[in-house]
């Protein structure tokens, strides 16, 4: 099978710092693939390595089966969209999108036709004569995407492109990006530190930590079956039981993750514990409770909010509660390297 992008034991060193440390991944053609991780985890460096903006310290990269480690950026079948859209303020939107084609020597009539077509793909064909200052943040983002698409890349690289947008616009752009990727059928590689973005748009997600990949999986499997304590804590919220806590509370050997929404309050169950509510956080669709169990352990519990229901007086800070859960919702974890 020929992959869109393949890393074979790739490393990138800055002095003694291993920004990317022995990463191997295979990204499929036509896949929406996200690289998720905290700042400094290596995800953006990997994107820059694909684009050719960084040089490898070790390993190899191939793009559609062709060795790409030593290719200059302009010879790689990829284009990049950055968080800073870098639009030319004095140019029309049409000329902004057509700029790369002008540099390549494409004649004006042809490049304007291609730029207009790219704008149509992102539903902005009507703004071609405007200036960037006349557009909203979301529209400028789509212009930046059109400018990348006009070169007809087989892989589109997106480096935290939604980070500058407000929450509602960011959520709207997530839907639009996914629809665009599906309609184009090309590979999108999306870098983000936002788990919500990665889970909502991606076919698969690679979770980065300290220059390495902790897990590559579908969004559902990442959430429901995290493999390491880091993934369990970074993708969503988890209660992580180390060996001592698992043995004490559950009679089980090893480390486990338990999602807060899988714990029931004041309802008997297979495994039970008692504790005191320390804090209550109303979060709209759910309420989160921070508990201190009688043995001193801390536990997070999330309870869905039913329409019109008030929080019972028995579920306020200082109140004693019983919690329960089942063994089958506890996810075994492997120790981090």
Curated annotation (Swiss-Prot):
Q: Does the keyword Ribosomal protein apply?
A: no
Q: What InterPro entries does this protein map onto?
A: AAA+_ATPase, ABC_SmlMolc_Importer, ABC_transporter-like_ATP-bd, ABC_transporter-like_CS, Mo/tungstate-bd_C_term_dom, P-loop_NTPase, Transp-assoc_OB_typ2
User: What Gene Ontology molecular function terms does this protein carry?
Assistant: ATP binding; ATP hydrolysis activity; transmembrane transporter activity
Which residues of the sequence carry a binding annotation for ATP?
37-44
Keyword annotations from UniProtKB, A to Z:
ATP-binding, Nucleotide-binding, Transport
Query: Matching Gene3D superfamilies, A to Z?
Result: 2.40.50.100, P-loop containing nucleotide triphosphate hydrolases (3.40.50.300)
Give the UniProt entry's GO cellular component terms: ATP-binding cassette (ABC) transporter complex, substrate-binding subunit-containing; membrane
A Pfam cross-reference name = TOBE_2
Domain ABC transporter, first and last residues per copy = 5-235
State the phenotype upon gene disruption: Inactivation of the gene does not significantly affect natural transformation.
Q: Which GO terms describe its biological process?
A: transmembrane transport
* Keyword set includes Transport: yes
The job of this chain, per UniProt, is described as:
Probably part of the ABC transporter complex YdcSTUV. Probably responsible for energy coupling to the transport system.
Question: Which family, according to UniProt?
Answer: Belongs to the ABC transporter superfamily.
Q: What is this protein called?
A: Uncharacterized ABC transporter ATP-binding protein YdcT
- Which species does the entry assign this protein to? Escherichia coli (strain K12)
